[in-house]
């Protein structure tokens, strides 16, 4: 398994257990699911109608996003102006690190990142923002949105802002 760790905060943000797709050469997107957690009843796949139960969320359980829950991501809020301030600083930091470690990737990063940020700004109200578990304000924001079907959530992380660790 490969764990993707934020190069600034050291927080684990995603793994290859989720189906990753590279977008614009700079973003990993992964579809998520909403799952039930908590409560004492463990779902073992029994027939709910025969067990006198339904598919409702029981008391003591909570419906959560599996990626957000698994990696203990913390929701945060931005307005457009504060997001742009954050993303400019973050992109500058990643570009500086790339110039030292992999200068050939700088132009790919700049072009792809600019295109993806425009996409986020264009549909800003649809996005949710998360930080890693440490809540480091300089660390990467994990972006969450829904696919065109309106029901499938996905997360997005910056390829150049993570290091892949095989465990």
From Swiss-Prot:
Alphabetic keyword roster: Cytoplasm, Cytoskeleton, Microtubule, Protein biosynthesis
Organism classification: Eukaryota, Fungi, Dikarya, Ascomycota, Saccharomycotina
Alphabetical list of InterPro entries matching this protein: Mss4-like_sf, Mss4/transl-control_tumour, TCTP, Translation_control_tumour_CS, Translational_control_tumour_p
SUPFAM superfamilies: Mss4-like (SSF51316)
GO molecular function: calcium ion binding
Record domain TCTP: where: 1-167
Pfam families in alphabetical order: TCTP
UniProt-recorded name of the protein: Translationally-controlled tumor protein homolog
Main localization (coarse): cytoplasm
Gene Ontology biological-process entries: translation
């Amino acid at each position: 398994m490969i764990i993707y760790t934020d190069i600034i905060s050291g927080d684990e943000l995603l793994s290859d257990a989720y189906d990753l797709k590279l977008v614009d050469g700079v973003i990993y997107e992964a579809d998520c699911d909403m799952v039930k957690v908590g409560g004492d009843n463990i779902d073992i796949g029994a027939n709910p109608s025969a067990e006198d139960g339904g598919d409702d969320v029981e008391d003591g359980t909570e419906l959560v996003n599996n990626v957000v829950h698994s990696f203990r991501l913390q929701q945060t809020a931005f307005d457009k102006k504060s997001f742009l301030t954050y993303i400019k600083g973050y992109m500058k930091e990643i570009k500086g690190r790339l110039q030292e470690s992999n200068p050939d990737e700088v132009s790919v990063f700049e072009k792809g990142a600019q295109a993806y940020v425009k996409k986020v700004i264009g549909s800003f109200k649809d996005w949710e923002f998360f930080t890693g578990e440490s809540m480091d304000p300089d660390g990467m924001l994990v972006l969450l949105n829904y696919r065109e079907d309106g029901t499938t959530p996905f997360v997005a992380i910056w390829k150049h802002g993570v290091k892949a660790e095989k465990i």
